[in-house]
Amino acid sequence: MAPAKKGGEKKKGRSAINEVVTREYTINIHKRIHGVGFKKRAPRALKEIRKFAMKEMGTPDVRIDTRLNKAVWAKGIRNVPYRIRVRLSRKRNEDEDSPNKLYTLVTYVPVTTFKNLQTVNVDGN
C-alpha cells in the first residue's frame, strides 16, 4: 500500500493560472468540426476555438476578436479553414464587478504556412 499523505504539506505559492500571459497556438479546426453539418460548421468552429481557449488558459471569460471571426467565416459557413493560428492573451479584467478576475482575448495571427510551427510564449506588449 502507498503511504498516506499528510494534510498540512501544501505549498503556499501563486498559481500559474493567475499570471498574465500571451501564447500563440495553432488550432486544428478540421478535426474539431468533423462530421458537423454544413450550416453549423463556422458557428461550431468558433465554439470550439472558445472551448480550446478556455481549456488552455483556464478562464471562463473568453473574448474573440472580430478579425478572427472574419477569418473563420472568410470562405463561408461551410468551408472553414483546416487550421488557424491564434494568439491567446490572458488579461486582467478592468471591470470591478465582474465575477472573473481574468479574461482571455483570442486574436488571429495570419501565417503563410503551418509547417514546423510550435506553441510559443509571446512577450507581453
UniProtKB/Swiss-Prot annotation:
The record's family statement is: Belongs to the eukaryotic ribosomal protein eL31 family.
Gene Ontology biological process terms in this record: cytoplasmic translation
Q: Which residues carry this modification: N-acetylmethionine?
A: 1
- Indicate where the modification Phosphoserine is found in the sequence: 15, 98
Q: Which gene encodes it?
A: RPL31
Q: Which domain of life is it from?
A: Eukaryota
Q: Where in the cell is it found?
A: Cytoplasm
This protein's species is Pongo abelii (Sumatran orangutan)
Answer whether the UniProt record assigns the keyword Ribonucleoprotein to this protein: yes
Name of the protein this chain belongs to: Large ribosomal subunit protein eL31
Gene3D superfamilies attached to this UniProt entry = 3.10.440.10
Report keywords, A-Z.
Answer: Acetylation, Cytoplasm, Phosphoprotein, Ribonucleoprotein, Ribosomal protein
Q: Which Pfam families is this protein grouped with?
A: Ribosomal_L31e
